[in-house]
A protein has these predicted regions:
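Mature N-terminal segment immediately following signal peptide/propeptide cleavage
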Residues: 45-88
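Bacterial Sec-dependent N-terminal signal peptides
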Residues: 1-41
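Acidic/aromatic-lined carbohydrate-recognition and catalytic surfaces
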Residues: 94-187, 191
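A short, compositionally biased domain-edge/stem linker segment
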Residues: 42-49, 416-419
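Carbohydrate-binding surfaces of carbohydrate-active enzymes
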Residues: 59, 70, 75, 88-89, ...
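Short, intrinsically disordered, low-complexity segments enriched in Ser/Thr and Pro
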Residues: 83-100, 257
Length: 688
């Protein structure tokens, strides 16, 4: 309340008096406000019960370019964010600005990385955020991925084709000095890195609960290895990996089968030694973990399920990808799904920078809400000198008073807050679990050239894993081998985490023996299974005998069908939704349903400038099937509007007011070019 009172008081002052008062407040460091805040200790944080966020206001990534960070700048930026409807920040430490022009001659003065002076400024930022009623998370390193100039050669990322190679990190806080990327498969190396990084952040973790953040993978993944990997591989699979290394990414046999075994072991290293270790260390420091597992060479559902807050990303990942993240959250009982949002909205690296249109942002936000996200993290806000807005980050929509978004920010953020708040209530609802084709992706290896980006080559990322269209009315969720194993079938429901499924849908070329074994067990207990095709066992030296027996047992069961049309005992959730994406949450009071405007369907990177332009009203007739009753309803989508409705336990529908009308966008068709900056040359193009 103190800060809100100060804002109201200052609004009635003239400019010069306001400036003097602000300077006094900044000089005092907000200590008189901070002292009034409860100083919580988190030596034993109860993260199992934590809501993590005190409200649903959107957050933003907050880039600190390597420089001499000043208290008055920190406070000024936070005040601006608070006034514009933001609920928190995620501090991300990056290179000095002169790195953008590849200047390696002129050194930018800055607090030394992880030094007491650096820690003091970070702690000040946290105390300012606390005083403003804002949250504050911290990236657990500088730039992406984890690594710095203190990582020794023998604890850096390794490649099995060249023992002298280590991945460098060249654009960190210490630029122009170069360091090494941490060996993410080496638990000891991680804890050495985490010890010094965590110690520097400890003072800032006093106060309100904070999160430690890990961005998307961005470790060189091809031929990734670590000490002892080959020996463990030989022990696990009873053959030597070395003879197959040179052709490990070939689609031919036996290399595809060997690659599956390699990916299976690599996945265990990534999840056990990195993601679980990161979450454990976060808890030791009294923080929660918030992680983008996207791009990691592992079982992606298990990875996302191993962290406290799984985070998606858009639009470098399509909105549909968020279903994987939200599925992992529901399977593991997590209630918050965040998203790094609006990244490279119109293209990479900086198309239409600072000219973004709110209507386009809303189009994307609605798409990810309908695919499971319930907390927005803007991408983002650079730390600027007090009173200025001259520093900008390239791969971002721009948050600042000089950007085109500034006028609409408070109202738009209020909209994002309302939707997020409602989509956090209760648990997500789905009628059918769909087996994610992880084995298929690992066997496939590289994506076709036309589907690759210069930063993404592998099918293992699941960028193009989509739900079957025939399942839309049942609001499917993904499941994997781990959660089939954890699930229990009782009272005609497959129960795991927050979900209570009525059936399992399997349409994969390959399925691991452990998954097939568990699927057969569940089907024998009565679980309805739609087995669209007969899978084969992946990997080199498979155990054919047991696999064939399990397939025979599975196919002989009456509750196992080969087409979804035969699964007529599984009633849908909502019919008539072919042209709108939706999300459903259930509370004791009934269902909360978010329906995205039909124009939000099928968004892909990049968005065209003004793609959201819309002058039409769309009406869609749906039927909600709930607890034995069918409730018909007509969805009326006015231009730029999505809908949030509540279906009470009495099956009566009420409308939640989330109306926000952005400025009418200007449409500019994207120029046609032979090849975009992010596209990969095909083999034919490379030879021309």
């Amino acid at each position: 309340m103190a800060v809100e009172f100060i804002f109201l008081f200052m609004n009635n002052l003239n400019k010069s008096t306001k400036t003097i008062l602000l300077f006094i407040l900044l000089f005092l460091g907000y200590k008189f406000i901070a002292l009034s805040q409860p100083q919580l200790t988190k030596s034993k944080p109860d993260l199992t019960q934590s809501k993590f966020y005190s409200n649903s206001r959107p957050w933003t990534r907050w880039w600190w370019f390597a420089s001499e960070i000043r208290k008055k700048d920190v406070a000024d930026n936070l005040i601006w964010l608070r006034k514009n409807g933001f609920g928190g920040v995620e501090i991300a430490w990056v290179y000095p600005i002169n790195r953008m022009i590849k200047d390696t001659i002129h050194y930018t003065p800055r607090q030394k990385w992880l030094s007491p002076e650096w820690s003091a400024m970070v702690t000040y930022a946290k105390s300012c955020a606390d005083s403003l009623g804002m949250g504050c998370d911290f990236t657990f390193g500088s730039l992406w991925p984890f690594g710095d100039i203190n990582v020794p050669f023998d604890e850096a990322t390794m490649n099995m084709t060249d023992p002298t190679w280590r991945q460098e990190i060249a654009a960190s806080w210490d630029y122009p000095k170069k360091g090494y990327v941490l060996d993410h498969l080496n638990k000891d190396a991680f804890y050495h890195y985490a010890f010094r990084t965590g110690n520097a952040l400890k003072p800032a973790l006093i106060g309100s609960l904070s999160g430690l953040f890990c961005d998307s993978w961005e470790v060189e993944t091809k031929h990734l290895t670590t000490k002892g990997f080959n020996e463990k591989f030989r022990k696990r699979f009873h053959y030597d990996l070395v003879p197959y290394i040179d052709s490990l990414y070939s689609k031919r046999m036996p290399y595809a089968a060997v690659r599956y075994n390699y990916m299976k072991l690599l996945s265990e290293y990534v999840i056990e030694n990195f993601y679980k270790s990161f979450t454990k260390k976060s808890h030791e420091l009294g923080a929660y973990s918030r992680v983008q597992c996207s791009g990691a060479p592992c079982d992606i559902i298990s990875a996302y399920a191993s962290v406290d807050i799984p985070e998606s990303e858009a639009l470098l990942y399509e909105p549909s990808y968020s279903n994987i993240v939200a599925s992992a959250a529901g399977l593991s009982g997590k209630r918050v799904v965040t998203s790094e949002t609006f990244t490279c909205l119109y293209g990479w690296p900086r198309d239409h920078h600072s000219e973004e249109q709110t209507a386009d942002l809303k189009l994307l936000a609605d798409a990810i809400f309908a695919n499971g996200v319930n907390q927005i993290i803007w991408h983002g806000k650079p730390l600027n000198p007090a009173g200025e807005d001259t520093v900008k980050f390239y791969a971002s929509v721009h948050l600042g008073k000089s950007g085109t978004l500034a006028e609409e920010l408070p109202a738009f953020n209020n909209y994002l807050e309302k939707v997020s708040e409602n989509l956090k209530k209760g648990v997500s609802v789905s009628k059918v679990a769909v087996y994610l084709p992880t084995e298929d992706a690992w066997m496939e290896g590289e994506l076709p050239t036309e589907k690759q980006f210069i930063w993404a080559w592998g099918a293992y990322e699941h960028r193009y894993s989509y739900f079957p269209k025939e399942l839309k009315a049942w609001r499917p969720m993904w499941i994997n081998s781990e959660f089939l194993e954890k699930a229990e079938f009782s009272n005609n429901r497959l129960k795991v985490g927050d979900f209570s499924f009525q059936a399992c849908y399997v349409d994969v070329k390959y399925m691991d023996l452990t998954a097939l074994r568990r699927l057969t067990e569940l089907a024998q207990k009565g679980l309805p299974v739609c087995l669209k095709q007969i899978p084969a066992e992946p990997g080199f030296h498979p155990s054919d005998a047991e696999y064939k027996i399990l397939l025979q047992k599975l196919n002989q069961l009456k509750n196992v069908k080969t087409s979804w049309q035969e699964m007529d005992q599984i009633g849908p959730l909502i019919t008539g939704t072919e042209s709108t994406d939706f999300w459903c949450r259930e509370t004791a009071d009934g269902l909360t349903l978010f329906f995205a405007n039909p124009h939000s369907q099928g968004l892909i990177f990049p968005l065209e400038y003004g793609q959201s332009l819309n002058h039409t009203t769309d009406s869609i007739r749906i039927a909600i099937h709930n607890k034995g009753s069918t409730v018909p309803y007509t969805l009326v989508f006015r231009p730029y509007q999505s809908l949030l409705i509540q279906l009470g336990s009495d099956n009566k529908i009420s409308i939640v007011d989330i109306y926000f009308k952005p400025k009418t966008p200007v449409y500019i068709k994207r120029p046609s070019v032979e090849r975009e900056k992010w596209e990969v040359l095909s083999p034919k193009q490379q030879t021309n």
